[in-house]
Swiss-Prot record:
This is 3-ketoacyl-CoA thiolase. It comes from Bacillus subtilis (strain 168). Pfam families: Thiolase_C, Thiolase_N. Pathway: Lipid metabolism; fatty acid beta-oxidation. One of its GO terms (cellular component) is cytoplasm. The active site is at C90, H347, C377. The keyword DNA-binding does not apply. One of its GO terms (biological process) is fatty acid beta-oxidation. Involved in the degradation of long-chain fatty acids. InterPro entries: Thiolase, Thiolase-like, Thiolase-like_sf_Thiolase, Thiolase_acyl_enz_int_AS, Thiolase_AS, Thiolase_C, Thiolase_CS, Thiolase_N.
Length: 391
């Protein structure tokens, strides 16, 4: 079987949804910026691309009409490069990488670009219009339970306290703030030139330009005392708050995958090798524990044990679920989200899987860690995990 390797990649900084720096920027434009930069970082690659695979959790409105195809056009790819938008909710950006890698491993592709794009400013998490199947809603309402309420269910079922959740959130912000101060994300980020329209002093519209180059959700001054003052967000007597939950965000990311032999022939140094990907199902009402099912499956496919993994990028949808995943699998917390997670850095849904993969790659290189895992829970009661090996 052929080897699938990642040879380049780039992501935008993550913006806060609604009022952040990317709120007015279309998600397909963000995706195109990342695709162009990914090609540039692959030595200005102009050869064959078998497919463009883009993950998106809410593929409608600005993210509809097979957004991946539009991203390819905006990025200047020839019309001969096909494209597909994939949706497995929060794992979409990792699913896109897996689809591309598995095609390469089978010999069906030799080169593909995978990624994810999401604007939670322009397309809300549940979409503009939600129409549940009434029969399913009556028979199994947990399939329509809000993500926040599932986080509360995890906290109650597994005894994850408010204090533990807040402490985990503080750690996320502290690690992210330290990483930002040390410039750890600079190599994975492509700055975005943003144009906004404002009303000038003469009361007429005027355009304003700025360059957005750094994740903007991190709050370095966050403390447990500050977080303890926040009210529960989903249940009157609950423990899940805005402070110990992931932020709604905007962003995009992309990576180029290649057959190892082709990369070597072109003189492109592989960053990591794709080892495996797995998904698993769990009760929808505790969807946050999804990685508990997915990680062991992915490790088995890769022929590895938990102790072989040096770094984990575990999406922090909510502190309650991230804590329970770590506890149940017995993961060393010092290996998890060493540069912060979604509570501090944001969670742009369909982009997240690719974003986390890029962050993992760069930290694996810095630490010379052989194996790393990207994992997340998925709305509806699932988990996903991908295993990567440093080249």
């Amino acid at each position: 079987m052929k080897e699938a390797v990642i040879v380049s990649g780039a992501r935008t900084p993550v913006g806060k949804a609604k009022k952040g720096s990317l709120a007015t920027v279309r998600p397909d434009d963000l995706g195109a910026i990342c695709v162009k930069e990914t090609l540039k970082r692959a030595g200005g690659y102009e050869g064959n691309i078998d497919d463009l695979i883009i993950g998106c959790a809410t593929p409608e409105a600005e993210q509809g009409l097979n957004m991946a195809r539009n991203i390819g056009a905006l990025a200047g790819l020839p019309y001969t490069v096909p494209a597909i938008t994939v949706n497995r909710y929060c794992s979409s950006g990792l699913q896109s990488i897996a689809y591309a890698a598995e095609k390469i491993m089978l010999g069906a592709y030799d080169t593909a670009i995978a990624g994810g794009a999401e604007s939670m400013s322009q397309v809300p998490m549940m979409g503009h219009v939600t129409r549940p199947n009434l029969a399913l809603a009556e028979k199994a309402p947990e399939y329509y339970m809000s993500m926040g309420h599932t986080a509360e269910q995890v906290a109650k079922k597994y005894g994850v306290s408010r204090e533990d959740q807040d402490a985990f959130a503080v750690r996320s912000h502290q690690n992210a703030a330290k990483a930002l101060a040390e410039g750890k994300f600079k190599d994975e980020i492509v700055p975005v030139e943003v144009t906004v329209t404002e009303i000038g002093e003469d009361h007429k519209p005027m355009e304003k330009q700025f360059v957005f180059s750094q994740d903007e959700g991190v709050r370095p001054q966050t403390t447990a005392d500050i977080l303890s003052t926040l009210r529960p967000a989903f249940s009157v007597d609950g423990t899940v708050t805005a402070g110990n939950s992931s932020q709604t965000s905007d962003g995009a990311a992309a990576v180029m995958l290649m057959d190892r032999e082709k990369a070597d022939a072109l003189g492109l140094a592989p960053l990591v090798k794709f080892r495996s990907f797995a998904v698993g199902g769990v009760p929808p009402e505790v969807m946050g524990i999804g990685p508990v099912e997915a990680i062991p499956r992915a490790l088995k496919l890769a022929g590895l044990q938990l102790q072989d993994i040096g770094l984990f990028e575990l999406n922090e949808a909510f502190a309650s679920q991230a804590i329970q995943v770590i506890r149940e699998l017995g993961i060393d917390e010092e290996k998890v989200n060493v540069n912060g997670g979604a509570i501090a850095l944001g969670h742009p849904l369909g982009c997240t899987g690719t974003k986390l993969t890029l962050s993992l790659i760069h930290e694996m290189k810095r630490r010379n860690e052989q194996f790393g895992v990207v994992t997340m829970c998925i709305g509806g009661g699932m988990g996903a995990a991908g295993v990567f090996e440093l080249c």
